[in-house]
Amino acid sequence: MLRAERGGILNVRSLASLLPIPDFAVYAASKSYLTIFSEALRLEVRERGISVLALCPGPVHTGFGEAAGRHGEPPETPSREWFYVPKEEVVRDALIALQGDRARLHPGWRAASLAAAISLLPMAAIRCMMRHRPRRVES
C-alpha cells in the first residue's frame, strides 16, 4: 500500500471498547486500543493515500458469540433483537466510509446513538451501570 500510495485499512472495534465491562476486561481493552491505534496509524499514512477506518458496529449476527463460548441469554431474545445491525448494512457502510476517508464509524442508528450517549455519561454512571448489569451464566 505504501508503494502504491493507495489502499485502505479497516480495524474492527466494538461498542465494548467504550465501556469497562466485567468479564470482558481484556476484550474491551483490546478493542479500545484499536481506536487510538487506528487514529495514530491514520495520521501516519493518510498523506500516502491510505485510509484507516475504526469500525464499531455494535452487535451483529455473525456466530462470534457462540464461537467465543458465551452463555446465558441467547442473542435472539426479543429484548435484544431490535439492537442488532444487519451484517449487510455494516459491510456497505464500512466500504462507503473507507472510501470517504472517515476515521470512525458506528453503522446503524442504534449503535451510533448508544455510542453518543455513552460519550456523554460520566464514568461514575457507567461504572454503576456495569456493576448492575446481568452477568453471564457459567454452565
Regions found by a protein language model. Give the residues of each.
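Conserved catalytic-site region of short-chain dehydrogenase/reductase
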Residues: S17-L19
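SDR active-site lid
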Residues: L43-R110
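Active-site loop immediately N-terminal to the catalytic Tyr-X3-Lys motif
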Residues: I21-A25
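Catalytic tyrosine of NAD(P)H-dependent dehydrogenase/reductases that use a Tyr as the general acid/base
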Residues: Y27, T35
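Residue(s) in the substrate-gating loop at a strand-loop-helix junction
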Residues: S14
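A transmembrane-helix-recognition feature enriched in membrane-embedded lipid enzymes
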Residues: D101-R136
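A short helix-coil junction within the Rossmann-fold of NAD(P)-dependent oxidoreductases
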Residues: M1-E5
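Active-site helix of classical SDR
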Residues: S30
